Amino acid sequence: MDLDGKVQPPSAQVGQQPLSPDAALHEPRLLQESGIAARVAVLAAPVLADLGLRLVRVKISGQNGTTVQIMAERPDGTMDVEACESVSEALSPVLDVEDPVKQAYHLEISSPGIDRPLVRLSDFERALGQEVRVELKTGLAGRKRFRGTIGPIEASSPIGGSKGALRLTRTDAKPEEETEVLLPLDDLHEARLVLTEDLIRQALRAAKAAREGDDGNNEEQDEEQEEPAPPRRGPGRFAPRHKTQNPEHNPAQNPISARAKPLVPAGVRTEFKKSKTGERGPAQKPHLASQAARKSDTGSSRSGHDMPRKPAPK
């Protein structure tokens, strides 16, 4: 990225050597939002970077009223529910103060999923050989939408512009059309992977490898935590009487609950939703909100003070 904030030609980024962790975290996107989504993206990007995550996309839809969807991931493409929750807790106060969305909305933090959008050069490198749908802004030879297999990024293409051009082997080409095309990334409007059986198999293999790696880490933790138990002794005659603690609530006595939760590999969708409904005004007390939530889940219920009392016998 140069001093003007523009993406450098891919010759300096693609096909040379892997990006450093800091460079991968701050790798610029090829696409930018517009309108309110752009304002949310400007606020969300630094918050995500502080958490070691990077922004994929911001989308605002009218689903369930108004939904603000923020896709995020780690530089390696992984994500987990805990990270989504951390983003929601860190980003919600910022959105409340800056107030980019005027009406009530639902905040949804999620990973990109299997059929993910491709928004960075590294996304195209990682998806090399996969099938993709591409939509251009102005089009190429009178055509805006293409579908085909992802090839390498051409840095020296005359139509590539400052971001290069994507070599695509078309699967939707007619007999009289060329199957090999170069799509300028400067004109890119949207690129999304096609959900195929091969893509699903790769995601399942990645999830299996992540689980096996997590099981190995848990076994090492179990071996480290296994220590000879001290001999049991009676409480004694004058020992204070207390309730026996449930070992399930003590992480030290229950190594299973102390295990680290596995990461969700790249391509597996995970999300965390947080609703922000009602008119803007003073915040409700937590216990009132929790009572309202319980009533909405279990139906209307009466407390002991609301139950009708029987008349006293005469």
UniProtKB/Swiss-Prot annotation:
Pfam families: DUF150_C (PF17384), RimP_N (PF02576). Keywords: Cytoplasm, Ribosome biogenesis. Residues 10-19, 247-256 have a biased composition (Polar residues). Signal peptide: none annotated. One of its GO terms (biological process) is ribosomal small subunit assembly. InterPro entries: Ribosome_maturation_RimP, RimP_C, RimP_C_sf, RimP_N, RimP_N_sf. Residues 1-20, 152-176, 206-314 are annotated as: Disordered. Belongs to the RimP family. Required for maturation of 30S ribosomal subunits. This is Ribosome maturation factor RimP. It comes from Beijerinckia indica subsp. indica (strain ATCC 9039 / DSM 1715 / NCIMB 8712). The lineage of its organism: Bacteria, Pseudomonadati, Pseudomonadota, Alphaproteobacteria, Hyphomicrobiales. The gene is rimP.
